[in-house]
């Protein structure tokens, strides 16, 4: 292998897993050429299937510095395809440009469908958060940006809250996307929850009678990037999608909490909006818990008294039973006349049902029609979902395809 990562002067930080990148590309290519512009000279060497075709030689003079590598993937090894997807590569280039502020990356496709993209972001991960939130409604205009370092570990965090109900946290170590999170992400989440609760208490936004906001509460509507540079990262598993260094947690927590506390003190209006958002999430969480409990029925016999006017079938065997969900009483009447009451149940729904994609759980579960469906089918929802409790093995939704 090239061994670049093992020599202390080579890289300040690296992926740190294999240290064999160039060597692997060389071994998997029919040919590979390297042009190194250095010390006023252009050095060149060509390889064929991993073996040098000739010795390293100087082929010219230059006033530039840098390396050009060309390679052709070996179709005998990559039997399915040797075609590169422009969009896949461009997405990764964009990600790297966001993670390394002020770097300029250009990707050009010189094949039949010629295209070229250039990525350069002066705002770095702050611009990344703005990019991710571009189609959302932020509750504070400027993303919060934090950077600092301790014991040789550099920490960068950018975050912005929006009006939505989901959170998106993306963490990176040495430019590697740690999909499964890890210690740096845990440190960030811990600090975020603690700092918001502390600020809320000190400024009397959270009253004595109020419970502390949970991690889920304070992360509702959050988009965040956590990027650290670590000289000796320890990844869990060969895919390096999770960071394992224990010190990464304490350093990320310390750097972020100190800067975020300062930010909240200097921006009381934004702080208020963030805590109000978390408080609403907490109320919704409590309401959803109560609503969920309302949907739990002790037995299937209670279904007959539901407001949804369920006309149940006489069979108690779910394997042959089916339920037809129809629009309104008029459709319900026709369906009841045409059904086989032995195994076909009819559930007429009235009014326009709620759009569950755009509503919070407490709102969804306070909707009579939704509760009727949950109780009639019998499986419950969320963490309590149990498919074996289904009262019908076929659910047929008979509605017209308009907006409601």
From Swiss-Prot:
Residues the entry annotates as binding Mg(2+) 2 = 400, 402
Task: Name the source organism.
Answer: Bacillus mycoides
Please, what other remarks does the record include? Few gyrases are as efficient as E.coli at forming negative supercoils. Not all organisms have 2 type II topoisomerases; in organisms with a single type II topoisomerase this enzyme also has to decatenate newly replicated chromosomes.
Instruction: State the UniProt keywords alphabetically.
Output: ATP-binding, Cytoplasm, DNA-binding, Isomerase, Magnesium, Metal-binding, Nucleotide-binding, Topoisomerase
Any one biological process term the GO annotation gives: DNA topological change
Tell me the cofactor note: Binds two Mg(2+) per subunit. The magnesium ions form salt bridges with both the protein and the DNA. Can also accept other divalent metal cations, such as Mn(2+) or Ca(2+).
What is the annotated role of this protein in its UniProt record? A type II topoisomerase that negatively supercoils closed circular double-stranded (ds) DNA in an ATP-dependent manner to modulate DNA topology and maintain chromosomes in an underwound state. Negative supercoiling favors strand separation, and DNA replication, transcription, recombination and repair, all of which involve strand separation. Also able to catalyze the interconversion of other topological isomers of dsDNA rings, including catenanes and knotted rings. Type II topoisomerases break and join 2 DNA strands simultaneously in an ATP-dependent manner.
Please give the chief subcellular localization of this protein. cytoplasm
What is the protein name given in its UniProt record? Answer: DNA gyrase subunit B
Q: Name one GO cellular component term.
A: cytoplasm
Binding partners and assembly: Heterotetramer, composed of two GyrA and two GyrB chains. In the heterotetramer, GyrA contains the active site tyrosine that forms a transient covalent intermediate with DNA, while GyrB binds cofactors and catalyzes ATP hydrolysis.
For Mg(2+) 1, which residues are the binding ones?
327, 400
């Amino acid at each position: 292998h090239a061994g670049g990562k093992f020599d202390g002067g080579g890289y300040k930080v690296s992926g740190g897993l294999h240290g064999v990148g160039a060597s692997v590309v060389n071994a998997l290519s029919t040919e590979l050429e390297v042009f190194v512009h250095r010390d006023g000279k252009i050095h060149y060497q060509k390889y064929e299937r991993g073996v040098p075709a000739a010795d390293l030689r100087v082929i010219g003079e230059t006033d530039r510095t840098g390396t050009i590598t060309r390679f052709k993937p070996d179709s005998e090894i990559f039997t399915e395809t040797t075609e590169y997807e422009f969009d896949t590569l461009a997405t990764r280039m964009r990600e790297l440009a966001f993670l390394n502020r002020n770097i300029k990356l250009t990707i050009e496709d010189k094949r039949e469908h010629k295209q070229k993209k250039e990525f350069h972001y002066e705002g770095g991960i702050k611009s990344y958060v703005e990019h991710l939130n571009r189609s959302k409604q932020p509750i504070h205009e400027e993303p919060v940006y934090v950077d600092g370092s301790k014991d040789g570990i550099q920490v960068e965090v950018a975050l912005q809250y929006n009006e939505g109900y989901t959170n998106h946290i993306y963490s990176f170590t040495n430019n590697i996307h740690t999909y499964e999170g890890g210690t740096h992400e845990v440190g960030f989440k811990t600090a975020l929850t603690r700092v918001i609760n502390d600020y809320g208490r000190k400024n009397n936004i959270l009253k004595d009678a109020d419970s502390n906001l949970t991690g889920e509460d304070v992360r509702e509507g959050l988009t965040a990037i956590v990027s650290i540079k670590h000289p000796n990262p320890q990844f869990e598993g060969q895919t390096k999608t999770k960071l394992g260094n224990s010190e990464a947690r304490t350093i990320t927590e310390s750097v972020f909490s100190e800067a975020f506390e300062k930010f909240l003190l200097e921006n009381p209006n934004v702080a208020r909006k963030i805590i109000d958002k978390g408080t609403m999430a907490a109320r919704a969480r409590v309401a959803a818990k109560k609503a969920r409990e309302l949907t739990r029925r002790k037995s299937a016999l209670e279904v007959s008294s539901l407001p949804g006017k369920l006309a149940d079938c006489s069979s108690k065997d779910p394997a042959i039973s089916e339920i037809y969900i129809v629009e309104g009483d008029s459709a319900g009447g026709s369906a009841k006349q045409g059904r086989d009451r032995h195994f076909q149940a009819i559930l007429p729904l009235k009014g326009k049902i709620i759009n569950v994609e755009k509503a919070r759980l407490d709102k969804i579960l306070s909707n009579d029609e939704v509760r009727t469906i949950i109780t009639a089918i019998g499986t419950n929802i969320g963490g309590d979902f149990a498919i074996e409790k289904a009262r019908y093995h076929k659910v047929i939704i008979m509605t017209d395809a308009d907006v409601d």
